[in-house]
Swiss-Prot record:
Keyword Lyase: yes
GO molecular function annotation: orotate phosphoribosyltransferase activity; orotidine-5'-phosphate decarboxylase activity
Alphabetical GO biological process terms: 'de novo' pyrimidine nucleobase biosynthetic process; 'de novo' UMP biosynthetic process
Record's protein name: Orotidine 5'-phosphate decarboxylase
Pfam families for the chain: OMPdecase
rRNA-binding found in the keyword field: no
Length: 280
């Protein structure tokens, strides 16, 4: 798989043929931030307060909306309003993994109304390519009111110890993304996936975005198997956007932590594109 990670976000925005990918790169460039904060909070009040406080420093807010105990229309309204106020995208970390017909209903409808407010969602290839086809059908349909404003990330790898998201699974994730590139804009992975060869050849316009989870300046991991890497290490390994949760929101000063991750992530990104231009 090819990578355009040595190009600037501005260059990639100009070249990308997917409108939501272009918007993401434009946000990153404008805010000088490649930070995705994983807001794993359990009430609407906590979630919206964090989004409002950290919004100026992030490119994307990642949610696990099914852990919000009092999810309601005010949750949706608040997320959408703050996304516009602070110019960030919303990524619902739903990890869709079911038959296509069910996934379509979970995404576009149901109690969580995900397609209404989440710019990005993700899915696992575990259920087969049909799940990706189903989501792509919904997201690219002319009847879909948010066409061009939504995108899908494939869960190609995970940061947990002992994960089975490796090898053939990762390759299948890439193959599916290539088949449905009108809706799939990138991957959740621990590194650039350029070493993995697929049956589908790369196109000139191919530019999948890499989101890396488990980014934490305290690299010890946790007792439940999560493994961490620093912002600089993640960018060096090919991340375009770095996802951090507890490393930011669980600190004594989340705003200061968000600024720190923003600065470190951006500095690592600038080093990467500078090295491209100087030939190092």
């Amino acid at each position: 798989m090819t990578s355009k990670s040595t190009l600037s976000y501005a260059e990639r925005a100009r070249q990308h043929d997917n409108p939501i990918a272009r918007k993401l790169f434009e946000i990153a460039e404008a805010k000088k931030s490649n930070v995705v904060v994983s807001a794993d909070l359990t009430t609407t009040k906590e979630l919206l307060e964090l989004a409002d406080h950290l919004g100026p420093y992030i490119a994307v807010l990642k949610t696990h909306i099914d852990i919000v105990s009092d999810f309601n229309k005010e949750t949706v309204f608040g997320l959408k309003s703050l996304s516009e106020k602070h110019n960030f995208l919303i990524f619902e970390d739903r990890k869709f993994v079911d038959i296509g017909n069910t996934v379509q209903k979970q995404y576009h409808g149901g109690a969580l109304r995900i397609s209404e407010w989440a710019h990005l969602v993700n899915a696992s290839i575990l259920a087969g390519d049909g799940i990706v086809e189903a989501l792509a059908q919904t997201g690219t349909s002319d009847a879909f009111e948010h066409k061009g404003e939504r995108g899908l990330l494939m869960l190609a790898e995970m940061t947990t110890r002992g994960t089975f998201a490796t090898g053939a699974y990762t390759k299948a994730s890439i193959e599916s993304a290539k088949k449905h590139s009108s809706f799939v804009i990138g991957f959740i992975s621990n590194q650039a996936l350029t070493s993995i060869e697929t049956q589908i050849p790369a196109t000139h316009m191919e530019d999948f975005i890499v989101f890396t989870t488990g980014v934490n300046r305290a690299t010890k991991g946790d007792p439940l198997g999560q493994q961490y890497q620093t912002p600089e290490a993640a960018i060096k390994r090919g991340a375009d956007f770095i996802i951090s949760g507890r490393g930011i929101y669980a600190t004594s000063d989340p705003i200061q932590a968000a600024k720190l991750y923003q600065n470190e992530g951006w500095a690592a990104y600038e080093t990467r594109i500078k090295n491209r231009s100087t030939g190092y």
